[in-house]
């Protein structure tokens, strides 16, 4: 509850928080170890607090794997999160490119 109160205080000053989704490019599917914790992500804090957040592509690594940009908003304000993501995608070409499968 304390974390959520601190988050709400920050959100009084900004519309959204933008962070990387992950500490680097996406993990290749064949490199994922079943049952291993996914500790390199930054999504947990928003999930833990029940805050709306989404991840969109913001580029690609040198080997073609996607880089994620996370946008998080105020409690129950999914609309702003989606609008910011939509504006970013309209301003950049990343959503048009596909990673190797």
Language-model segments: residues:
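Serine-dependent amide/ester hydrolase catalytic core
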Residues: 1-48, 96-101
